[in-house]
Amino acid sequence: DRTGINNNEIPDFFAKGRMDWYWWREAIQVPTVVDFARQAGLTASTVTWPVMCASGAEYNIGEIWAPQEEDDPTPWFTRANSPAVEEIFEANKHMLRWMKTPQMDEFAAKCAADIIRAHRPDLMLLHLSYVDHQRHRLGVHGDLEHAFRFIDGQMGLVLDALEETGGVENTNIVLLGDHGQLYCDEMFHLNALFHRLGWLQTAEDGSLADYQVYAANCSLSAHIYLRPEVDREMVYCVLLEQQKKYPK
């Protein structure tokens, strides 16, 4: 609640298709590491880093994609990117295949290396998502050797750029993941429960017509949205009862 970001997607439970993502920096309600870096007089770069479109970083390439796969991504990136990276984006945009990875990661790593060579920012945030993608696709126990080797190769491009510019010895490199993952063999559909309780209503085609209580999926968790008139304590008690009933 404090940051304003609790999911990849902006809640729109009545959307007929894919929901928009939180792409734009303005959605974040607290200062970011980029803000603190710039306040300290440092230059910053964000490359396909989540929720950093129009981030204010001097060398920013947003994480964004066009609504449809066949659409030209240029107008979207033009809005999201900083003017200083226009040539770098134009030189590398042919690598993009909509939102698909590993192509997005190949594009991002190449742009990051080019930014380092051209501008040498003090801070760079780079998001590579292929391991995440493969983990979601193959499961916790899937073979990720290929994905790890791929990411290793992309990081090699970035390190090569640092070595060429003489910055590798004076650079702190931090690798991190944005979430963990647990094995799951059962699913619980909270909205089916809410429907039985009369807390949400569906149309004839099964789509959502209205709700008083709604569960928005977020992988192994869910966010429960309530209309203002709904008794929060009552909903909480029902959920606790279900947790006791289904402890797994």
Show which residues each predicted segment covers.
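His/Asp/Glu-rich, glycine-adjacent segments
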Residues: 1-139, 244
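Secreted, luminal/periplasmic, and some membrane-associated catalytic domains
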Residues: 7-22, 157-248
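Beta-strand elements within well-structured catalytic alpha/beta cores of enzymes
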Residues: 37, 112, 122-129, 144-162, ...
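Short secondary-structure boundary/capping segments
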Residues: 61-63, 139-144, 188-194
